Amino acid sequence: MDARLLEILVCPICKGPLHYDRGAQELVCHADKLAYPIRDGIPVMLVDEARQTVEGTPVDPAGPAQGR
């Protein structure tokens, strides 16, 4: 995932930060408890494509999307 792209992406619902889950290939919004898939290296930032996350679900320890 391109670090420059990750720096500008935000949750389409709340405009909050996203966290990159490398293992699941998803961008996660903790505020809305949604995970947006990354397909072929392209984030799919459509609410209809997002899945609900379970509170407390760990995100890749590599950290938040910013700076990646």
Swiss-Prot record:
Residue ranges the record marks as coiled coil: none
One Pfam family of this chain: Trm112p
Similarity remark: Belongs to the UPF0434 family.
Gene3D superfamilies per record: 2.20.25.10
GO cellular component: cytosol
Domain of life from the UniProt record: Bacteria
Originating organism: Burkholderia pseudomallei (strain 668)
InterPro entries linked to this entry: Trm112-like (IPR005651)
The protein, known as: UPF0434 protein BURPS668_0926
